[in-house]
Structures are given as C-alpha cells and as structure tokens.
Amino acid sequence: QFHDAVKSNVAGRLDEVKDLIEEIEKRAEAMCIQERLYREGKLKKRTNHCDTKVNNMMFDAETDKVLCVIDLDTVMPGFVLSDIGDFIRTGANTGAEDDENLDNVNVNMDIFKAYTRGYMEKAKSFLTPTEIKLLPYGGRLLTYMQTVRFLTDYINGDTYYKIHSPKHNLIRTKAQFKLLQSLEAHAGEMDAFMSEWL
C-alpha cells in the first residue's frame, strides 16, 4: 500500500513528505528480519493478541497492576515480537502517539526495562533465544510499521484513520518516526539488557 500511495500521489502531498519517504525506504530491508527468520525456520508463530497497546489492558485503579487484556477479537497466530513491539511503541513512549512537540517523544527506558523484566519472568520458559534477543527489535518494527501506516494514509488523503485536523496523520507520522529514532538510539542499551536472559 505504501508504494502504491507514493506512486499514485492522489492527494498531491508527496513533495512535502519526501524526506520521510527516504527515511522509510532506508530502513525497509532491516524491517524484514522477522519475516526472513520465519521463512528460515528460526522464528515461529504463536498465539498472539496482535493489538497489545496499553489501552487494551485494564488496570486496577488502586494498585495500577494489570488485571486483564481486552479486545480479544484480534487474537490469532503471529510473532511475539509484534505483541511486545506494540506495547513498547505505546507504553514506553514519553509522548503521545500524535504529539506535535517532538521533544516530548522518546523511549522511556525505565518502562521498557520494567515491562520486559515482568514479561520475561513468565515468558523465559517458552521463548527461544532468537525471540529473546529480538524483543527490542519488535519495538522498532512496530513503530516503523505505524509510521508507514500513518504516512500512507496522509499521502492517500486521510482515507483510513480518523483525523482531527488536516495535518493530523502527518503529525502522527512525525511523532512515530521520532520514537523510532529514539528506539534506534537506545538499541544497544536494550540489547545489553536482554543479554540477562540469554
């Protein structure tokens, strides 16, 4: 869809987003690791929620502990990296998904570490070393994918996501891309943190 949107440029917005398109294209090959490893038999599909953003979790009002996961209509076979990645994208972001002030948008490493530590307490027994090693990549992948989705919709004239202003999808794109850059900048620290379970 992204390449079709760029090719057709139906809303005439291509010129203002060429720099973002270049950044997406530059990362495209690196974002195919999950599928490549699956084809090579090094990564398997599991039962996944497939929409593990923070607002699909119910929290206890007094303790802030997670009570349960909701929105179960999305459960299907998928990759652990995607489920982890969407939580990192939404839960460890210091800004809003559509934050206009990009200075607000970064990865909160304390949240990343706390979430990962809690997840690994339960998941270490069944995850493969490849999955464990690639959990931080899942955050980058899902943030990249959401950047592409918002940008594609902006190029197409805002036909998929509900918008609240004419530039809303562009604002979302830039905020997600800033988060991606922050995740990339912290990749070494995240990878080192994961070595505790390898």
Give the residues covered by each predicted segment.
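ATP-dependent phospho-/nucleotidyl transfer catalytic cores
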Residues: Q1-H49, V54-C68, L141, T159-S165, ...
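A structural signal for short hydrophobic/aromatic patches embedded in well-ordered alpha helices
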Residues: I24, Y115, L134-L135
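Active-site capping/gating regions of soluble enzymes
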Residues: T52-V54, I111, F126
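Hydrophobic side chains within alpha-helical segments
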Residues: K53-N56, D86, R149, L179
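Activation of the activation-loop gatekeeper triad in protein kinase-fold domains
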Residues: I70-V75
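Active-site activation/catalytic loop segments of kinase-like enzymes and analogous catalytic loops
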Residues: P77, L81-K124, L141-Y160
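All-alpha amphipathic helical-bundle segments outside canonical DNA-binding/catalytic cores
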Residues: L127-G139
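Short linear sequence signals and composition-biased patches located at protein termini or domain-edge surfaces
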Residues: P129, R149-D153, T159-E189
